[in-house]
Amino acid sequence: MKLNIAYPVNGTQKTVEVDDEHRVRVFYDKRIGQEIEGEAVGDEFKGYTFKITGGNDKQGFPMKQGVLLPTRVKLLLAKGHSCYRPRRSGERKRKSVRGAIVGPDLAVLSLVIVKKGEQELEGVTDATVPKRLGPKRANHIRKFFGLTKEDDVRDFVIRREVTKGEKTYTKAPKIQRLVTPQRLQRKRYQRNLKVRNAQAQREAAAEYAQLLAKRLAERKAEKAETRKRRASSLKA
């Protein structure tokens, strides 16, 4: 069985091949989310605590949280479910998934280091992989660098170098939700436009109501005139 060990603190991970079945037997009958002492796996993991996060069986079917079985099952999966990515809107599909209980049929078991042990693990705890991309949203940049609202966020955007052919240049993401004078001016314009449109609609409605009242009065007067003429003709 292969153990895929991840250390989120440093952003590293490494796959370790374990040929001795007795060493991985400690994981059997354990579920996703449970924690295991690393000393039971080997002396190099003394003091470590691992958390089971998933895995794949020998045929490549992924483990699914919540399926309390050590075998494969077929489930009707939709958008939002793990182990399935819908290709069309509203699509559902019956897929084979592996249960969340660890067994000997697994090819890869994913672990996360919850507690670091005495020895350093080569390529995992002794190395650091920096984040390639920094925060994009203005508030997230402020939180990341501990800035106040008075500080200019644009000076703190994390830029990265890009080499295209022989030319090297820096690239920065577009800051989202950045409040600038142009944005405030645009908001003011939109608000004023909304007020003007509402005012124009009210004026048009008042004008229409006035015209309608005038037409009704004319029709009423016309009917009264017709009745008057008819009455005078009957008298004659």
Curated annotation (Swiss-Prot):
Ribosomal protein keyword on record: yes
UniProt cross-references to InterPro entries, sorted A to Z: Ribosomal_eS6, Ribosomal_eS6-like, Ribosomal_eS6_CS
Name of the gene encoding the protein in the UniProt record: RPS6A
Family: Belongs to the eukaryotic ribosomal protein eS6 family.
UniProt GO molecular function: structural constituent of ribosome
SMART domains per the UniProt record, alphabetical: Ribosomal_S6e (SM01405)
One GO cellular component term noted in the UniProt record for this chain: ribonucleoprotein complex
Pfam families: Ribosomal_S6e (PF01092)
Superkingdom assignment: Eukaryota
Swiss-Prot/TrEMBL GO biological process terms: translation
Identification of the protein by name: Small ribosomal subunit protein eS6
Record-listed Phosphoserine modification sites: 232-233
Alphabetic keyword roster: Phosphoprotein, Ribonucleoprotein, Ribosomal protein
Phylogenetic lineage: Eukaryota, Fungi, Dikarya, Ascomycota, Saccharomycotina
Disulfide links within the chain: none
Modifications after synthesis and translation: Phosphorylated.
